[in-house]
């Protein structure tokens, strides 16, 4: 079945995520959930002290697609650093919009327990790579930073409180069809309506909502499933046809 169908797409994402989690459990790896948010200058709106949304005077006109490219560049630097340090990770990334349409990233990554602190510090370093001064205390005091969570946040996945796939499930559904989510608290809308908005936003700006990190390419798995389904429904009859007109040329 085609992944252009939202239900099929959501089911495939959940299956792939479950496969990663099962592998992580077999290997004794741990999961960490990360959130990356772009600096203030990428946001057209901001929330004031009284909770109202107002114009952001720091906004430099960057589009959502350009912001996503910025985050992708940070991830490229992060991935290179992790590779240099011998700290491999694998998992999934979800890109979704803030209330003002600015993209932010959620990443669920698996790693060796011994690499966890190094991975966290590396992702934090690059998340705060630019415009770090906007997080500094004013007037200057100790500690130097009030809070880095507007730009970078992380949370350990605790298997006793729920599995990693279940934790990521709502982010997958929120950006496909909103199934089993209820209301989208961040957007303050029913989840199915919020999913329509998220899909339209991603389509308009040409943003890739989901990305697999590490692991085998999904294309082979999809093709094997297609062949399996074709056999099941009798669509494949007789021996497979050679790719070339004359098999002698294969040599």
Residue ranges and their predicted role:
Residues 108-110:
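Short hydrophobic/aromatic beta-strand micro-patches
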Residues 1-101, 113-251:
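Right-hand nucleic-acid polymerase module
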């Amino acid at each position: 079945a085609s992944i252009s169908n939202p239900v099929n797409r959501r089911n495939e994402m959940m299956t792939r995520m479950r496969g990663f989690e099962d592998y992580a459990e077999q290997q004794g790896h741990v999961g960490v959930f990360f959130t990356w948010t772009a600096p203030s200058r990428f946001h057209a709106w901001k929330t004031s002290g009284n909770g109202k949304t107002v114009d952001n005077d720091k906004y430099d006109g960057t589009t959502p697609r350009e912001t996503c490219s910025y985050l992708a560049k940070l991830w490229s630097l992060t991935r290179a650093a992790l590779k240099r340090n011998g700290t491999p990770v694998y998992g999934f990334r979800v890109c979704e919009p803030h209330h003002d349409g600015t993209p932010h990233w959620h990443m669920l990554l698996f790693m060796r327990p011994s690499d966890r602190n190094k991975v966290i510090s590396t992702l934090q370093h690059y998340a705060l790579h630019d415009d770090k001064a906007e997080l500094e205390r004013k007037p200057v005091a100790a500690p130097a930073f009030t809070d880095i969570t507007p730009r970078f946040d992380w949370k350990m996945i605790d298997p006793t409180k729920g599995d990693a796939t279940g934790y990521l499930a709502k982010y997958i559904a929120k950006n496909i069809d909103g199934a089993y989510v209820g209301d989208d608290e961040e957007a303050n809308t029913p989840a199915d309506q919020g999913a329509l908005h998220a899909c339209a936003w991603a389509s308009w700006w040409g943003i890739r909502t989901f990305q697999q990190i590490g692991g085998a390419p999904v294309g082979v798995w999809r093709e094997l499933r297609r062949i399996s389904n074709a056999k099941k429904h009798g669509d494949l009859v007789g021996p497979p046809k050679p790719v070339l007109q004359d098999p002698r040329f294969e040599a």
